């Protein structure tokens, strides 16, 4: 089961576990939760789960007295205040159910317990779903500013607080996967940079959270799958962010203007040229098939599959085979009866062709070759390159070369040389015609342990204890010889060869407690720690979790997919962000900028409209307001939800009328397959009401 499927499954099971007297319920989520669920479910799917309407918690709303309310939110005091605000309206929800997506602290529960809505609260639960599944094996936690917070000097005093938030997000993934991991971390004790303890601190915070949870749920540790969680940070591999990658996913994100996983393109249709916006996600089977292939292999796969489609489809008139990307684009114009397939092929053919055009124009074959020599420390013959600088200078002197390409080459050269003297750096800057303002990028790289400037008397030190090139004789493209450090580390971990000094255990674990292939458990909608051990043997694949603090790369994502297939394991990778090389340059340029220029979300006044709205008895109920994708996402997930109920006190009350289903729009109404009847008050039975507190 993929992370997307897992999270969707758990989310729906949590919704369906909430029993309302009104049968149907209003779902109210905060904006951050809306962003999470938009990746794996559509509003139309929610309406099929007895959800009458979906609304945003922070927006002004008028409660609907015909339905009970299900609030799904993060455990923040301001968001709880939004729930309390609803009670100020004349029309009020007859019952309230609350699900927190992350661990909730006792003061917040006490605030609900002593509030005026306490008697209406039916259930309070915690569903550990505070993470965003972006791919079948990739997730993000917290927010995209996290990496910058970890390295910006203004945040030095609150680094542990930031890492704690990240640790809670990782823990949500652990509970969702039903694992109680042995935790290891990257800890280069002798490294000179101050951030060398980052992974160690994060790993220990995660360990404390796991131990606290297990102390409150004694059965969890025994029933959960035993696995390994590896915590590393960006300093593990400082070369990977700057390399030109020539696998499909990495290359299109490096060279093309992809924003929020969307790419604008044009398609030739029966009526002429049509504009489209392609969405890159796991619903696109063409994309998931080729995203980790080398671009040449990806193009061959596209052409092969397209030609096979032409042969198999008797309705397709033009039976001639495509021999080039241009042939395929022309033939796609006749696929009007297969619009979804046509759009997918057109999107990826367009991107592949544009990448190859840029490859030729920017002479990336020459640039990529020297990048591989610098990053691996060897040439294609496996020997130490002797003429790196003489090959590098013409590329830096090239007037038409991209500035970002020159900076990336210089960074890789400095990493290769383990630093250069200051005068040499200035000479290289002049060759490259770079502004001195770009010097900040090089200086900031030192925060990750990379030596940039050295004295003539300084000796070069061995930066890494791992090899970053494939053994001689391996079948690999010359421009793809570099092996991400994370891949080497994970393979050593799988083979039980990982250095315990450089990658120590936390939680007093030892190598003898490593997981075995049989120690796994099945997923279901109930908390996984309640499942019997006999169920565990049905899942043979071992789970492994790796988290890269500070941000990850597309090559590292690919690594986890490759090793999962190679070793028959479920390896999941997480971070706070995945950047393209140019985004990494922008990231490293910001470390010394004034804090006000960076616009951290926490520095802006938080504007919550619903707390400022004045209740009006004549207010018209607003339509559900949630940003959902236009296409259905193939995602599902599971998480181990944990109840935090207090003893329930029963009280009597009458059942409320059910109004007609409020659709979010006319379009939604047309798409709804199920008609919802209007219930009257003819019920003679009185429903029992109870407060969770």
From Swiss-Prot:
Region (Disordered): 514-534, 606-693
Keyword set, alphabetical order: Cytoplasm, Nucleus, Protein transport, Transport
Domain of life (superkingdom): Eukaryota
Any single Pfam family the record assigns to this protein: Sec1
GO-annotated biological processes: intracellular protein transport; vesicle docking involved in exocytosis; vesicle fusion; vesicle-mediated transport
Keyword Repeat on entry: no
Family matches, as InterPro entries: Sec-1-like_dom1 (IPR043154), Sec-1-like_dom3a (IPR043127), Sec1-like (IPR001619), Sec1-like_dom2 (IPR027482), Sec1-like_sf (IPR036045)
Function per UniProt: Involved in the final stage of protein secretion.
Protein name: Protein transport protein sec1
Organism of origin: Schizosaccharomyces pombe (strain 972 / ATCC 24843) (Fission yeast)
């Amino acid at each position: 089961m993929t992370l997307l499927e897992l999270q969707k499954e758990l989310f729906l099971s949590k919704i369906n576990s909430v029993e309302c007297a009104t049968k149907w319920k209003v779902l109210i989520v905060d904006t951050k939760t809306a962003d999470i669920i938009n990746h794996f479910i559509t509003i139309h799917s929610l309406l099929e789960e007895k959800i009458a309407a979906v609304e945003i918690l922070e927006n002004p709303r008028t409660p609907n007295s015909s339905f009970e309310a299900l609030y799904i939110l993060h455990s923040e005091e301001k968001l709880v205040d939004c729930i309390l605000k609803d009670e100020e309206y004349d029309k009020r929800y007859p019952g309230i159910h609350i699900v927190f997506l992350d661990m909730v602290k006792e003061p917040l529960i006490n605030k609900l317990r002593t509030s005026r809505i306490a008697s209406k609260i039916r259930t309070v639960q915690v569903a550990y779903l505070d993470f965003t599944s972006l791919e079948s094996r990739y997730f993000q936690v917290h927010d995209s500013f996290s990496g910058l917070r970890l390295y910006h000097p203004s945040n030095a005093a609150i680094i542990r607080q930031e890492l704690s938030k990240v640790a809670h997000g990782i823990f949500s993934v652990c509970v969702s996967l039903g694992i109680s991991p042995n935790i290891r971390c990257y800890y280069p004790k002798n490294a000179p940079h101050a951030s060398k303890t980052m992974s160690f601190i994060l790993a220990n915070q995660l360990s404390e959270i796991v131990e606290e949870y297990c102390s409150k749920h004694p059965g969890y540790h025994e029933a959960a799958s035993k696995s390994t969680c590896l915590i590393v940070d960006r300093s593990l591999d400082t070369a990977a962010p700057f390399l030109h990658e020539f696998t499909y996913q990495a290359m299109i994100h490096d060279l093309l203007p992809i924003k929020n996983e969307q790419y604008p393109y044009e398609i030739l249709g029966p009526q002429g040229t049509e504009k489209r916006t392609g969405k890159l996600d796991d619903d696109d089977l063409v994309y998931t098939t080729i995203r980790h292939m080398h671009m040449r292999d990806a193009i061959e796969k596209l052409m092969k599959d397209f030609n096979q489609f032409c042969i198999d489809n008797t309705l397709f008139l033009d039976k001639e085979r495509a021999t080039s990307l241009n042939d395929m684009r022309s033939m796609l114009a006749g696929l009007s009866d297969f619009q979804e397939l046509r759009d997918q092929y057109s999107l990826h053919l367009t991107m592949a062709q544009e990448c190859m055009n840029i490859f030729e124009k920017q002479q990336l074959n020459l640039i990529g070759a020297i990048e591989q020599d610098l990053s691996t420390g060897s040439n294609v013959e496996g020997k130490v390159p002797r003429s790196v600088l003489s090959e590098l200078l013409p590329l830096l002197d090239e007037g038409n070369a991209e500035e970002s390409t020159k900076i990336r080459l210089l960074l890789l050269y400095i990493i290769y040389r383990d630093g250069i003297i200051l005068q040499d750096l200035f000479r290289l800057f002049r060759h490259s015609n770079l502004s001195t303002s770009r010097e900040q990028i090089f200086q900031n790289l030192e925060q990750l342990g990379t030596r940039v400037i050295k004295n003539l008397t300084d000796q070069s030190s061995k930066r890494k204890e791992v090899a970053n090139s494939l053994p001689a004789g391996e079948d690999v493209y010359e421009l793809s010889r570099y092996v991400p450090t994370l891949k080497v580390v994970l393979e050593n971990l799988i083979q039980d060869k990982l250095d315990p000094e450089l990658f120590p255990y936390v939680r007093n674990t030892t190598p003898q407690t490593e997981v075995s292939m049989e120690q796994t458990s099945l997923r279901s909608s109930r908390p996984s720690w309640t499942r019997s051990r006999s169920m565990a043997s049905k899942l043979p694949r071992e789970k492994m979790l790796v988290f890269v603090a500070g941000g990850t790369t597309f090559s590292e994502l690919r690594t986890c997919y490759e090793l999962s297939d190679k070793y028959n394991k479920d390896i999941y990778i997480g971070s706070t962000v995945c950047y393209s090389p140019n985004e990494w340059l922008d990231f490293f340029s910001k470390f010394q900028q004034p804090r006000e220029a960076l616009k951290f979300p926490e520095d802006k006044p938080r504007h919550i409209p619903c707390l400022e709205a004045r209740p009006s008895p004549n207010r018209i109920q607003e339509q559900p307001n949630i940003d959902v994708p236009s296409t259905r996402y193939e995602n599902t997930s599971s998480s181990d939800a944990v109840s935090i109920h207090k003893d329930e006190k029963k009280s009597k009350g009458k059942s409320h009328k059910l109004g007609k289903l409020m659709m979010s729009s006319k379009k939604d109404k047309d798409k709804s397959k199920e008609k919802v009847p209007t219930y009257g008050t003819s019920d003679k039975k009185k429903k029992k009401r109870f407060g969770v507190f």
